[in-house]
From Swiss-Prot:
This is Cytochrome b. It comes from Allochromatium vinosum (strain ATCC 17899 / DSM 180 / NBRC 103801 / NCIMB 10441 / D). The gene is petB. Belongs to the cytochrome b family. Keywords: Cell membrane, Electron transport, Heme, Iron, Membrane, Metal-binding, Respiratory chain, Transmembrane, Transmembrane helix, Transport. Heme b b562 binds at H91, H192. It holds the Pfam family Cytochrom_B_C. GO terms for biological process: respiratory electron transport chain. It comes from the Bacteria. GO terms for cellular component: plasma membrane; respiratory chain complex III. One of its GO terms (molecular function) is ubiquinol-cytochrome-c reductase activity. It is a multi-pass membrane protein. It is found in: Cell membrane.
Amino acid sequence: MSAEKTENLSWIDKRFPLSETWRNHLSEYYAPKNLNFWSFFGSLAILTLVIQIVTGVWLAMSYKPDAGLAFASVEYIMRDVDWGWLIRYMHSTGASMFFIVIYLHMFRGLLWGSYRKPRELLWMIGVVIYLVMMATAFFGYLLPWGQMSYWGAQVIVNLFAAVPVVGEDLSVWVRGDFVISDATLNRFFAFHFLLPFLLAGLVFLHIVALHHVGSNNPDGIEIKEGPKGNRWSDKAPADGIPFHPYYTVKDLMGVVVFLAIFGYVMFFNPTMGGLFLEAPNFQPANPMQTPAHIAPVWYFTPFYAMLRAVPPMYGSQFPGVVVMFAAILILFVLPWLDRSPVKSMRYKGPIFKWATGIFVVSFVALAWLGIQPASDFYTLLSQIFTVLYFAYFLLMPIYSSLDKTKPVPERVTS
């Protein structure tokens, strides 16, 4: 580095910890040397968040949050705004890809035991991020003012009316009116624009917490507690390598593959057969005509299936609402439900592995059932898979403590 650059960097470092931040979070942040395919999804989640924020701001420049103009403004963006169709499809495709990446990232956490000590708070921040993501997606779902988005929002907002005593007042407060209207659209647009920046702040906290406790790995072994000394530093973990350049370059390979898939979907199949963009949403909202079948967007369908699986009690859908929210909130207590002496799925016994497999099948099945029209048979299946979903968590203290585990090596494996 030239003397001039060194002098400029020194001037900055005296006023802002630029070099220290670079060292602490990149060049001298030591990550386990055995990170595999599953480690890609953290960086891909950041990438998709950036895509959503940038494209969302661009769309907001031409979108009209007005019940009489919203649908037309989306069509205007698609037809008359330069590259508007591309930005709109980037945003709609990015929303689904964001959830795909996050679901895989959370599954990685289950496989590696990334919710266990000392990462309980890291996991809980991640669950808060997931909740804010769902809220952001829900508020944004109404904005195109299409037929399915209108009636989907109507169904979800009506769930607040199921809350005893205050339900009716609560649903009116959420809508800002007695029905989904211009007032609802305005407040949903405001929240949809604001929440991604809150999400970015939570992601920052998530990364700070991660770098404080250190990255987990497929073996679930804490490299900070192992032997010290490697080719870069005598004080660094022996099984760690600098995040930069090793994992930044590796993540770039993942980004290239991801963007290739992203681009294929965006250019050749942006609706994904109605999963990413539903056909009724290409029709303007009609409050006087209810669609034959109302279903939320695919990343909400597991919880929607749980809602429909619970029969009403005294004419109220409140028990289903409780089950739906409990299915998400139970993730907060996961770190204290797992009593296994080992973290990683590699060394857990067959009972835990079978339980996790059944849990994954149940979640995917519920996602599919949530899209299907209601029927007695589908309701029965939803009830079975809902029970299996909750059994995974509620029975975990028992089967995780009884299961036979494999011996864990002292150092990470290659």
